[in-house]
Amino acid sequence: MAAEPPADGRDPPADDGAAGDGAVESAAAEALLSAASEQLTLVYQGEVYVFDPVPPQKVQAVLLVLGGSDMPPGLVSMAVPTTFDEKSTTVAARRVASLMRFREKRKERCFDKKIRYSVRKEVAQKMKRRKGQFAGRADFGDGSCSSAPCGSTANGEDDHIRETHCQNCGISSRLTPAMRRGPAGPRSLCNACGLMWANKGTLRSPLNAPKMTVQHPADLSKTGDTDDSKANLCAEHNQTTMKTDTEMVPEQEQKADVLPPTKEEDSMATS
């Protein structure tokens, strides 16, 4: 025979094996109901309204009327908004804190061209000076090395740099615009030989190189004397030509005064 339903109209209790998860969920809901009082708290325009007692079914019905989402039975759904509010408040607080830190850092930043005199002062104090002024590398090298051997080595290096010769044609570095790199290394060829070596990879024949010699001061004085003598001869020649021209001017004027006879005079002479 089928089991008759109870008189109160309630469902009979299910067996232990058939209850399963439903019993666990009902137990959890009863525990939450007993732990939290059935109070409804509403906050509207800064005012707080508390209603006691309010069952969850009424709250769900009100939310459905207002167009909210459907709530599951039990108070578990009522605890979700509180946790969401807590998360939102913590996120907002973190944002405010990060914004304050950013503003503090931005105050320290300066995108304008600020002259830092302290750094300039340190750099100026580290720089070498000569007679109260900033000295370059060349001046500092000349002034710092006051001893005789050091000065002699520096002068020897300068002379070696100045007095180099082309290894191909033998021309001096003073007679070429610049010494260039060659097969033997830097500053081993003259300008012409270095350019040919860089462009074609071959060295020009020394026979085509111009023969240029350095003139000594005695030779320069001799050439200067010869130039002066040539200049004096040219000046004397110009003076003699000017004198001859002035002497010939009166004769030319006399010839210009003697005019040739006209046609009328010729006809009268013939008649």
From Swiss-Prot:
Q: Where are the zinc fingers (GATA-type)?
A: 166-193
Q: Please report any disulfide bonds recorded for this protein chain, giving both cysteine positions.
A: none
Start and end residues of each stretch annotated as Disordered: 1-23, 238-271
User: Per the UniProt entry, what are the Gene Ontology biological process annotations, in alphabetical order?
Assistant: regulation of DNA-templated transcription
- What upregulates this protein? By abscisic acid (ABA), and drought and salt stresses. Down-regulated by jasmonate and wounding.
InterPro entries for this protein: CCT_domain, TIFY-like, Tify_dom, Znf_GATA, Znf_NHR/GATA
* Any single GO CC term annotated in Swiss-Prot or TrEMBL for this entry: nucleus
Q: Where in the cell is it found?
A: Nucleus
| Keyword list, A-Z | Activator, DNA-binding, Metal-binding, Nucleus, Transcription, Transcription regulation, Zinc, Zinc-finger
The annotated regions of Basic and acidic residues compositional bias extend over 252-271
Record-linked PROSITE patterns: CCT (PS51017), GATA_ZN_FINGER_1 (PS00344), TIFY (PS51320)
Identify the residues that the record assigns to the Tify domain, covering every copy. 33-68
Q: Which GO terms describe its molecular function?
A: sequence-specific DNA binding; zinc ion binding
Q: Where is the CCT domain?
A: 95-137
Query: Which Pfam family, an example, fits this chain?
Result: GATA
Q: Which domain of life is it from?
A: Eukaryota
> Can the keyword RNA-binding be found in this entry's annotation?
no
Biological role stated in the UniProt entry: Transcriptional activator that specifically binds 5'-GATA-3' or 5'-GAT-3' motifs within gene promoters.
UniProt record similarity statement: Belongs to the type IV zinc-finger family. Class C subfamily.
**What name does this protein carry?**
GATA transcription factor 19
